[in-house]
């Protein structure tokens, strides 16, 4: 098999996005759109990927580190000029080169593989990826002769009335014989209104040289959708989300209302898990089998075990074991580690907290910078007081401890195994194993005093 190369065009300014963020770095379902493109290419057994960068080059290189080589296009002088910048990496090499736009996040590896195969079968010097749409306004048209052979690409503004009625369009993705590509690029002129060097002119140069130029027609226009503004970004995200959600459903996940469920592309979900409407699953979240995530929940870059029930809660960068109950209205902040058979009830917040197996935090609790053992019960209103205004300190609670309601554990503090903290206590010293910790003022009842307070009739 001949060598395969790919050039990804990612140097455009994206002025229509009206954004400080470099255009191709705008995310589509949790991943920058240029990374979608490069990740699809990387599955094609390509020998080298070269990404043409311009504005914001450093940020693009950070996202694609290890996935691509990079060449800078200092001046944006057109698509042919952009590809020519890869001359130092690819010129003179035998093989075929894919040219793909970095703002087409929906293009799939299977389509590019089919394009490569068709190019090889036709023994072409260039093959254009085309598609048919109902309204081709604004797109370059594919002009074929009576035998269906490609003659040229005509831009919409240059097309005759007859040519404008053609519905087959140029998607902007190509496959070239590598040597023929770079030889032709040297002859592309900028003799046009914009004064730019256009890649479709390479097709004309090759045709004039009597080389074979083919066109592979794909079925779906969606894959060729280019993102140039926020409206197109929203459309691409919608289409990508549908693709992601349908893939999960095919793999045994129930999405009660897929049109109202947001799932990033790198999320993994086990079989027989049920995701209700209004759920957002972001980042590299992994959810096991037989879980239920109810409406209003958000889970970000977290690992969730099996048979976990998350009710209307938020989980960020945390780990949850098996058979755990979370919520409603719980908030697991980063670095929470919840072990098996734990209950995290309503209005409970954890942060950098390890919660041991079988422990219950039923309601209205804050545990930050805490290490909690097995089979602990923490009563309503209890707090691990971890911050003194300058420094954070740790609370350690042993196994089989009972913490009564409305207790304050002033860190740093350690509560030993099987200890009992009396309700309403403010614990400032370590509590030994098997001890009762009680720290509150003695109650004093002043008989008859309430009559002088006028608090009731």
Swiss-Prot record:
InterPro entries: Bifunctional_GlmU, GlmU-like, GlmU_C_LbH, Hexapep, Hexapep_transf_CS, NTP_transferase_dom, Nucleotide-diphossugar_trans, Trimer_LpxA-like_sf. Its cofactor is Mg(2+). GO terms for cellular component: cytoplasm; membrane. The keyword ATP-binding does not apply. It comes from the Bacteria. It catalyses: alpha-D-glucosamine 1-phosphate + acetyl-CoA = N-acetyl-alpha-D-glucosamine 1-phosphate + CoA + H(+); N-acetyl-alpha-D-glucosamine 1-phosphate + UTP + H(+) = UDP-N-acetyl-alpha-D-glucosamine + diphosphate. Homotrimer. This is Bifunctional protein GlmU. It comes from Listeria innocua serovar 6a (strain ATCC BAA-680 / CLIP 11262). The gene is glmU.
């Amino acid at each position: 098999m001949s060598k395969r190369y790919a050039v990804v065009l990612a140097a455009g300014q994206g002025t229509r996005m009206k954004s400080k963020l470099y255009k191709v770095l705008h995310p589509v379902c949790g991943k920058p759109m240029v990374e979608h493109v490069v990740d699809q290419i990387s599955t094609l057994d390509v020998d080298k990927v070269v990404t043409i960068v311009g504005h914001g080059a450093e940020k693009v290189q950070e996202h694609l580190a290890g996935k691509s080589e990079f060449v800078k296009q200092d001046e944006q002088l057109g698509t042919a000029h952009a590809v020519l910048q890869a001359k130092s990496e690819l010129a003179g090499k035998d093989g075929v080169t894919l040219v793909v736009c970095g703002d087409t996040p929906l293009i799939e590896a299977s389509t590019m593989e089919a394009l490569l195969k068709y190019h090889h079968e036709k023994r072409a010097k260039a093959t254009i990826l085309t598609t048919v749409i109902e309204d081709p306004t604004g797109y370059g048209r594919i002009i074929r002769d009576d035998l269906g052979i490609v003659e040229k690409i005509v831009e919409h503004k240059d097309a005759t009335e007859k040519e404008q009625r053609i519905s087959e369009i140029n998607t902007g993705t190509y496959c070239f014989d590598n040597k023929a590509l770079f030889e032709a690029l040297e002859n592309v002129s900028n003799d046009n209104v914009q004064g730019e060097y256009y890649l479709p002119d390479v097709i004309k140069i090759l045709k004039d040289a009597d080389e074979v130029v083919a066109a592979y027609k794909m079925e779906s226009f969606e894959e060729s959708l280019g993102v140039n503004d926020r409206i197109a970004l929203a459309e691409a995200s919608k289409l990508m989300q549908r693709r992601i959600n349908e893939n999960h459903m095919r793999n045994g996940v129930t999405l009660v209302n897929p049109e109202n469920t947001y799932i990033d592309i790198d999320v993994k979900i086990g079989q027989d898990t049920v995701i209700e409407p209004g759920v957002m699953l972001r980042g590299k979240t992994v959810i096991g089998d037989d879980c239920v995530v109810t409406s209003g929940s958000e889970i970000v870059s977290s690992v969730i075990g099996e048979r976990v029930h998350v009710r209307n809660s938020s989980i960020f960068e945390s780990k949850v074991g098996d058979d755990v109950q979370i919520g409603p209205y719980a908030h697991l902040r980063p670095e929470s580690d919840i072990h098996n058979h734990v209950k995290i009830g309503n209005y409970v917040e954890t942060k950098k907290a390890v919660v041991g197996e079988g422990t219950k935090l039923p309601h209205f609790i804050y545990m930050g910078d805490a290490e909690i053992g097995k089979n602990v019960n923490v009563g309503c209103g209890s707090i691990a007081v971890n911050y003194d205004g300058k420094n954070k300190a740790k609370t350690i609670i042993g196994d089989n401890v009972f913490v009564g309601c409305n207790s304050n554990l002033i860190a740093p503090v350690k509560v030993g195994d099987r200890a009992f903290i009396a309700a309403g206590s403010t614990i400032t010293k370590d509590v030994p194993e098997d001890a009762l910790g009680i720290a509150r003022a003695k109650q004093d009842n002043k008989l008859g005093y309430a009559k002088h307070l006028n608090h009731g009739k």
